Amino acid sequence: MVLIGLMGGKGSGKTTAASYLIDRLGFIEKSFADPLKKACKELFLLSDEQIYGTQEQKETPDDRWFGCTPRKMLQYVGTDLLRDYLDNIMPGLHKNIFTHHFRLWYRDLMMKNPHACVVISDVRFQNEADFIKELGGYLIKIDRPGIASDDTHPSEVELRSIKSYDIVLVNNKTIEEFYSQIISCVDNASQMN
């Protein structure tokens, strides 16, 4: 069993890294935002491209929803509604709706396949980083010089202050060199378990 969490700003290479782990190394991807994306896709009648597409597709205002972008919809529903307020009706949940959902899913997966390798591609909050470490996971921060975010949403701001990662991958060379760094991280993560 190997559990890897990926963190980094928009456009840093998290999706590229996760895709490599899935396609080349047989990892299973589970993001904290999976249930949120499914719910928002249905609620706001969003397309796959608006949810899972390019940065441009996620940032394009949707006139049906008064010019709100799919990214803003996900941020607001995920953080401002679910993460910050669900504890009001589920005391004890605190801000852990997405980690709690993952814990239930992961427990079921480990019972079925204790040797599964899992990548979480969207670590954005300290409680998520702490949760991955609690499960014995390996946390990779991906930094891509020249890609700066001016997004002031709490999910982007808190991400910048997390220091509990195991390693920083600097994504500033060729894709092959980036993949080589990922392989080294998997080797390190495998040795931890």
UniProtKB/Swiss-Prot annotation:
EC number: 2.7.4.13
Amino-acid positions noted as binding dGMP in the UniProt annotation, renumbered to this chain: 10, 36-37, 58, 122, 124, 128, 155
Keywords from the named record: ATP-binding, Kinase, Nucleotide-binding, Transferase
Record's catalysed reaction(s): a 2'-deoxyribonucleoside 5'-phosphate + ATP = a 2'-deoxyribonucleoside 5'-diphosphate + ADP
Protein name as it appears in the record: Putative deoxynucleotide monophosphate kinase
Enzyme class: transferase
Family: Belongs to the dNMP kinase family.
Binding site for ATP: 13, 16
A single GO molecular function term of this UniProt record: deoxynucleoside-phosphate kinase activity, ATP as phosphate donor
One Pfam family this sequence matches: DNMK
InterPro entries to which the protein is assigned, alphabetical: DNMK (IPR048444), P-loop_NTPase (IPR027417)
